[in-house]
């Protein structure tokens, strides 16, 4: 949720019915308000942060994530992660933007190098916070080296289009929310079920071994071939290679492994 319509009824419903809640916040006020605006064009930071604090406080330990997107405007995204932590939030995620080449928000090759450095800064700071007894969780560094996903899950990934689908308010079915509105990937509706079997079959074959460039990659069983939607929007094919995404994913896994090694040696 972007938070604008959160009230006590929403908070109560989320506490009773939702095992996890994802709250959209891009970090520092000036960063968040660049793109997250209300219908009048005003930034939403001041309106939503108090609501997010109230919702998180009410959950009493249930899962939540404060989740943001960083763009060309803030490749120094760790400042935004630390800002969220300073607000009192401890379960955090920041995702790189996926945008068409030439889009003002798109990450450049120069940005990618900055972002890689930022991932290292974040990992080191998380270790420091952990030693000080005030840990934070960063979604992309959650790595279980002993009891991780089964091999089927490692190969198939998120299961979009096969194990789950997105349902629009009008009852239409799509492989996931990022394909909503693209009629090529309309799968059917809740009344008739899945009628476009070709799309479902296409997604069944979208896995860690479907991409030629993944076959010799050391990280393929961590990413399961990556996000089909990101690949599609970047290359035009759900089995394409979104190279920026690959580079950043591998850097995140490197940092997550480094943290595990550091924790084991302490």
Per-region residue spans from a language model:
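Short, small/polar residue-rich loop motifs at catalytic or cofactor-binding pockets
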Residues: 158-161
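Generic beta-strand/beta-sheet core signal
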Residues: 24, 67, 95, 139-141, ...
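Radical SAM/AdoMet-radical enzyme domain recognition
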Residues: 1-97
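Short, flexible cytosolic linker that couples an ABC transmembrane/permease module to its adjacent nucleotide-binding
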Residues: 150-155
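Flexible glycine/acidic-rich beta-alpha junction loops that bind and position SAM and/or redox cofactors
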Residues: 30-35, 91-113, 135-149, 178-186
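Radical SAM enzyme core and accessory elements
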Residues: 170-172, 209-266
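C-terminal accessory region of radical SAM enzymes
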Residues: 114-147, 177-224
């Amino acid at each position: 949720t972007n938070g604008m319509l959160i009230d006590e009824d929403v908070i109560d419903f989320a506490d009773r019915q939702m095992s996890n809640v994802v709250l959209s916040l891009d970090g520092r006020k000036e960063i968040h308000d660049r793109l997250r605006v209300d219908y009048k064009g005003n930034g939403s930071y001041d309106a939503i942060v108090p609501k997010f604090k109230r919702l998180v406080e009410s959950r009493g330990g249930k899962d939540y994530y404060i989740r943001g997107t960083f763009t060309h405007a803030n490749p120094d995204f760790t400042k935004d992660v630390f800002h969220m932590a300073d607000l009192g939030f401890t379960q955090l995620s920041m995702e790189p933007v996926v945008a068409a080449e030439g889009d003002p928000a798109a990450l450049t090759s120069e940005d990618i190098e900055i972002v890689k450095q930022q991932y290292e800064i974040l990992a080191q700071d998380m270790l420091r916070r952990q030693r000080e007894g005030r840990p934070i969780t960063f979604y992309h560094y959650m790595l279980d080296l002993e009891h991780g996903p089964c091999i089927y899950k490692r190969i198939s990934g998120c299961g979009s289009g096969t194990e789950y689908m997105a349902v629009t308010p009008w009852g239409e079915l799509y492989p996931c929310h990022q394909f909503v509105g693209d009629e090529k990937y309309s799968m059917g509706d809740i009344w008739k079920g899945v009628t476009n079997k070709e799309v479902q079959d296409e997604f069944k074959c979208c896995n860690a071994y479907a991409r030629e460039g993944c076959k010799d990659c050391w990280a393929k069983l961590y990413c399961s071939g990556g996000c089909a939607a990101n690949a599609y929007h970047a290359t035009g094919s759900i089995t394409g290679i979104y190279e920026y995404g690959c580079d950043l994913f591998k850097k995140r896994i490197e940092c997550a492994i480094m943290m595990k090694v550091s924790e084991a040696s302490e």
